Amino acid sequence: MPLYQRGDVRIRYEETGSGFPLLVTPGGGLNSRVSIWPTAVFNAMEVFKNDFRCITMDQRNANGGESTGPVPVDNPWEAFADDQLGLMDHLGIREFFYMGYCIGGCFAGKLLQRAPDRVVAAVFCQTVGHLPQDPRVMYRHGKENWVPDFIKGRPEVSIDMIEAYLHNLYAIQPDFLYSVSREFIRGCRTPILVLPDDVPAHPLQTSIDVASLAPNAEITVFPWKEPAELKNRTIDRVRRFLQARIPMRDAAQ
């Protein structure tokens, strides 16, 4: 299992296929890791491996994964972007597509902000976002589903650090995508495709807002997971959306 190291951060990644690069991260909140793919709504590493060079990774400090590093209390979304862009640098990749499931919608927003000249197109699949009726749902998810196992293996990390980390992830911008503002998405001209969901951690309104605000965004039908024929057409729409945006110099190769 390949790893890349940058200072005191170690990232485990996998890749398959060939063609224009597609960085794709699974769901799971702060436990986003490669081993989650078999339970995803669809396994992008499998369905797109004949179309793109598919790259995935364990996110930093995900329980059950092999990526480790400091807890970036002061700049958590920036740190995730550092890890993701650092992996692309390590692989010698300049331009790429990005597709993020669940928490990956927040990753997508930050990558689009940090590297607009590198992310050629982005797909938001069942993105997390702020839910006004339950504004602490993601904070609670992290505290219940990530913290207990994480602190068992990292006794040097204090509860105060963890509380500050979760606060800075989900309460600094307690609206929309957490990682970027509505104003940023409104001005983002990168092509975006949105696959909505409608559960407390993946509010339908967040997906609608991304698709409504971003000037070059599209959104699929909803619901799209059933029947199987509709789900397959939705997956093919993602494929065609990305293929149509491969830079000409790469498409000609």
Q: What is the predicted role of each segment?
A:
Residues 7-67:
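Conserved HGGG/HGGXW glycine-rich cap/lid loop of the alpha/beta-hydrolase fold
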Residues 42-46, 56-96:
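Active-site loop/oxyanion-hole signature of alpha/beta-hydrolase fold enzymes
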Residues 58-62, 128, 223-225:
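Short beta-to-alpha linker loops that shape the active-site pocket of alpha/beta-hydrolase fold enzymes
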Residues 94-130:
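Conserved hydrolase catalytic core segment
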Residues 131-188, 250:
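The alpha/beta-hydrolase serine catalytic core
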Residues 188, 194-196:
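Short beta-strand/loop motif that positions the catalytic acidic residue
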Residues 200-206:
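Conserved alpha/beta-hydrolase "acid-adjacent" motif
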Residues 217-253:
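Catalytic active-site module of serine/aspartate enzymes centered on a nucleophile-bearing elbow/loop
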